[in-house]
Curated annotation (Swiss-Prot):
CDD domains attached to this UniProt entry: Ribosomal_L1 (cd00403)
Name recorded for this polypeptide: Large ribosomal subunit protein uL1
Organism classification: Bacteria, Pseudomonadati, Pseudomonadota, Betaproteobacteria, Rhodocyclales
Family to which the UniProt record says this protein belongs: Belongs to the universal ribosomal protein uL1 family.
Purpose: Binds directly to 23S rRNA. The L1 stalk is quite mobile in the ribosome, and is involved in E site tRNA release.
Keywords carried by this UniProt record: Repressor, Ribonucleoprotein, Ribosomal protein, RNA-binding, rRNA-binding, Translation regulation, tRNA-binding
Database matches in SUPFAM superfamilies: Ribosomal protein L1
Pfam families to which the protein is assigned, alphabetical: Ribosomal_L1
HAMAP family: Ribosomal_uL1_B (MF_01318_B)
Matches recorded under InterPro entries: Ribosom_uL1_bac-type, Ribosomal_uL1, Ribosomal_uL1-like, Ribosomal_uL1/biogenesis, Ribosomal_uL1_3-a/b-sand, Ribosomal_uL1_CS
Gene: rplA
GO CC list: cytosolic large ribosomal subunit
Quaternary structure annotation from Swiss-Prot or TrEMBL: Part of the 50S ribosomal subunit.
Amino acid sequence: MAKLTKKQKALASKVVAQKLYPLQEALTLAKETAIAKFDESIDVAVNLGVDARKSDQVVRGSVVLPAGTGKSVRVAVFAQGEKAEAAKAAGAEVVGFDDLAAEVKAGNLNFDVVIATPDAMKVVGQLGQILGPRGLMPNPKVGTVTMDVVTAVKNAKAGQVQYRTDKAGIIHATIGRASFSVESLESNLKALIDALAKAKPASSKGQYLKKIAVSATMGPGVRVDQSTVVA
């Protein structure tokens, strides 16, 4: 394990391990521990009471963060005809079908989100080995396989984030940047937690939201008192 620098040790000392902080105080600490020269992400880790080994307990979906992500998103859409024109009008940077598939196969992936109409999945399905490992494969569960390409493009541009439990049943997501106000980060985190609550699997028993922690990219984790998050 790499040794902490003096500056990192000083930052870590600001945060009391295992202490539960009220949400606004936790976010303030996360912002204060972001000292890199770039605008660090503010991330959240949510431990869920699910058995991620069971397919019916995998929590997956998407949510539009009200204050956005602070990131400019390039969108690619696989569609034809009217849907292709609608996607372009909605602001998609890259729109195509077989021609776009050829670009992807050639290694030209100059986009952050991929959306597809259902009929395009016969083409997109052949790109799984390229798109899948990069987290770009369209999926109806997160709203990226849809006939409503206009809404999908607008959501992606507006700050939609996708989430999925990892093998340990933890959701990792970015809720903004260190330059965001505490209020903006708070509204984004609450929107994510609300979405996760609605996505609770019917087979999940016991406590569902087990632990919430926020952190800057290079900063220590700050545990959040859940009573200050969930109404």
